[in-house]
Amino acid sequence: MRKPSTIFLLAAVLLLAACAGPASKAPYGTYTNPILGGDYPDPSIVRDGDDYYMTHSSFDYNPGLVVWHSKDLVNWEPISYALKTYLGSVWAPDISKIGDKFYIYFTVHNRSNWVVTADTPYGPWSDPVDLHVGQIDPCPAVGDDGQKWLFLSGGQRIKLTDDGMDTVPGTLEKVWDGWEIPEGWLTEGLAMEGPKIRKVGDWWYFIAAEGGTAGPPTSHLVAIARSKSLDGPWEESPYNPLVHTYHNTDRWWSRGHGSLIDTPDGRWYIVYHAYENGYYNLGRQTLLEPVWLDEDGWWRSYGENIVEDPIAAPLPLQPYDRKARLGEFRIGLDWKYYKDFDPSRAKVENGVLTLQATGSSPADAAPMMFVAGDQAYEFEVEIDRDPGATAGLVIYYNSQYYIGEGISNAGTLRWRRDRGGRRAMRTRDVTHIWLRLRNDHQIVSAYYSLDGKEWKQDDWGIEISGYNHNVFHEFQSMLPGLVAAGEGEVRFSNFKYRKLD
């Protein structure tokens, strides 16, 4: 593997220095991180020719395991989802192509590890198959002798059957103890997870996440070891960690859980997740940075904080606006639900989403949500509800913690946590209304309109920076969404989303 060209290195250095240098130093332009803003944790990526595919943990959101496609590694479009039913909290998938088939291996928390397959990443994906093995974060690898293995958290692996659809009992073994985190570093502990196995040239590389995925800002990291054989022994890189947050003042916190990926012309990148400093409740976002393989066969970074500045684009950019199609209510691609959901409840026709009401509040009504990913935004929708239904907007962490505004026969409702809403009588018995929620850098406020033109601000607001995993656990984020509770139907139309300064 050759070193990066002098031109490429010069471009990277110039861009790192606050983009000092003409655009000609980056022939395809530049990109800034994140490449997927918002809650897209535990990224796994695969290249098939000139096409890239990626998926992430979906946790308690359903449909799960959205598959993304890109031609340039920067702009991503959702193309399918691999899980149609709710199995539980889905963790740390791995998407790979073995032979002519695509596989996604994944963990269902407190249950087992599973696999789904498809002939193309566009689906359809198979029903999930139980692999009958514990641990988390599965990653398949096929040895030089053709034996299939499944690598797991804690530096362990287990044999797979020839078809890759089950594990072989009695073959679980530990192959690497992980990189020893230096004394004095502030982390959550070793927490070795997220194994990714790649063969480049004559070397097998074991890429692992360590340090804990949340906790203090300096917790997470990417460590690498290598071996001439999948059987080991594994030699640790003298340049570990490849990715890490060193300072609390950095923009990106808890950087880790990396996957290596190459371009057709032999350049290398790593995708991983990180929290944004001060915005934990956006979730772990997906970042991309270039790396290189030195003459001694070790992976190297271009700089400690290269991800904070514009970076030379790897390929000709093909922009895609992820928010542009929210008004189409594409369930499973742009929109999802919290935990189990009956798909027969939803119908989309001529730009109108009709939801069958259920439950009594956002806590048990399975809100329909999307990933905003912006520090400040507002969203609004026109609502037409049956008299027995309660409808509204939320920014939702889980069934206990959410913020929002609804409308029922009793008037306007303010939703906060899992408590009953506070009512304003001025909108009593209104069935047709426009609602808007604004999240202005974690200060949430609500607005309503009776004609879609004249808006009035409601008399409440709340600060939501504490609504995050380090407080509430569950690895969720604050997602904007729609609620239909009570009895009857709610019709949502004219949905709008705006990013704010």
Task: Cite the ranges covered by each PLM segment.
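Bacterial N-terminal signal peptides
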Residues: 8-17
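Bacterial N-terminal signal peptides that target proteins for export
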Residues: 1-8
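Carbohydrate-active catalytic/glycan-binding domains of CAZyme proteins
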Residues: 19-501
